[in-house]
Amino acid sequence: MPGKHQQFQDPEVGCCGKYFLFGFNIVFWVLGALFLAIGLWAWGEKGVLSNISALTDLGGLDPVWLFVVVGGVMSVLGFAGCIGALRENTFLLKFFSVFLGLIFFLELAAGILAFVFKDWIRDQLNLFINNNVKAYRDDLDLQNLIDFAQEYWSCCGARGPNDWNLNIYFNCTDLNPSRERCGVPFSCCVRDPAEDVLNTQCGYDIRLKLELEQEGSIYTKGCVGQFEKWLQDNLIVVAGVLVGIALLQIFGLCLAQNLVSDIKAVKANW
């Protein structure tokens, strides 16, 4: 009988997974670099880059931080995944996997803690919003963010309009010389659909009136309660987005680990 010869195929790196991971990460790299550039440009316009102490001078949140942090994380992840896949560099691929895995577990832990400690989270959110209410006039980006939130969720302050008493320009003390005394920002006002020109003085002296008289002119519900209501009303959409992000992260992890295994198998045959 003729001898049977068995042929073994040498292991090779899968091109599909390699270039899919490369393409997947180059998008994140570019987007991250764009966010980071926008953040640094915004800081440059505000003079923060020439005066780093300005970062700590602001009592509230500087929204530019979101662009810088998100852009920085996306840039680092995108670079490691992109170059690691293209150059078949196991160190960069492992770094990508560990970094992405750490972010995933931090997100998972944050979600669990937010569910378990709902009351504590609510109190912290109240405190966070009120700290930003105090700093409303200190930073234009923060001011625009608060105005957007109050208009979008039809709310005013953390718990209600009286939270604006925390701001030096809007408080009702006799020593306050501001024209905005006992008022609220225009973003708290109930807009008239027929009004073409925005009335930025609509909130002046409004808190001198009784609460029932305020209801037709300004939003009387707090932003924390309105945000919770929005989450409940859009729970399916929010959950879908979060699950989608988690699946993308798991998919990226699997691709990176599979590529590392292929590279190790090829190197083992050298």
UniProtKB/Swiss-Prot annotation:
Residues 41-63, 116-234 are extracellular. The chain crosses the membrane at residues 20-40, 64-84, 95-115, 235-255. It holds the Pfam family Tetraspanin. GO terms for cellular component: plasma membrane. Disulfide bonds join C155-C223, C156-C188, C172-C182, C189-C202. It is a multi-pass membrane protein. InterPro entries: Tetraspanin/Peripherin, Tetraspanin_animals, Tetraspanin_CS, Tetraspanin_EC2_sf. It is found in: Cell membrane. It comes from the Eukaryota. PANTHER family: TETRASPANIN (PTHR19282), TETRASPANIN-17 (PTHR19282:SF470). Part of TspanC8 subgroup, composed of 6 members that interact with the transmembrane metalloprotease ADAM10. This interaction is required for ADAM10 exit from the endoplasmic reticulum and for enzymatic maturation and trafficking to the cell surface as well as substrate specificity. Different TspanC8/ADAM10 complexes have distinct substrates. Seems to regulate VE-cadherin expression in endothelial cells probably through interaction with ADAM10, promoting leukocyte transmigration. This is Tetraspanin-17. It comes from Mus musculus. The lineage of its organism: Eukaryota, Metazoa, Chordata, Craniata, Vertebrata.
